[in-house]
Amino acid sequence: MKRKFWWPILLLVVLIFGGWLIVSQSLRDNASQQYEKTKVPTLFLHGYGSSHRAEEHMTQAIVKAGVTQNVIRATVSKDGTVKLQGALPQSAYNPLVEVEFEDNKNANYRQNGVWLKNVLVKLQKTYGFKKFNAVAHSMGNLTLAYYMLD
């Protein structure tokens, strides 16, 4: 009698565990397919007094999630000159660009907007980008807004 009692419980546990495995795998597969592969770069703009290090956590998480494998950095000097670090292969999809302003405490947002334009011109000349996405924090939002105003 005791032996017959355990079989249904064991069967129930196996079914629940098997169902959980199937559902979790399905959710994982769906999560990896929730993005679109494009050639459009996403620029990350840091906040006041910050640097590319603040952006690295986000870009590394995106790479770890499998959305892209391509991250470069655009460093803007105090005179507005842009230097690209790293390179994007032609096959790159969903490329990420960490934008770093060396003058990271410049409160002249109009100037920062011009410097962002310099970054975009450099990216366009180097890679032919015509569109971009942006993720910005604090001063980065104002920089983006002033770029769009000019």
Description of each model-found segment:
Residues 1-15:
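N-terminal Sec-pathway targeting helices
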Residues 16-32:
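Membrane-interface motif at the C-terminal end of an N-terminal transmembrane signal
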Residues 36-40, 92-95:
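A short, charged/proline- and glycine-enriched loop
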Residues 39-47:
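Short beta-strand element of the alpha/beta-hydrolase
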Residues 44, 96-100, 133-135:
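Soluble periplasmic/extracytoplasmic beta-strand elements of cell-envelope proteins
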Residues 49-129:
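Active-site catalytic motif of lipid deacylating hydrolases and related acyltransferases
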Residues 135-140, 144:
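Gly/Ala-rich beta-loop-alpha elbow adjacent to hydrolase catalytic centers
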Residues 148-150:
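Primarily recognizes the serine-hydrolase "nucleophile elbow" in alpha/beta-hydrolase
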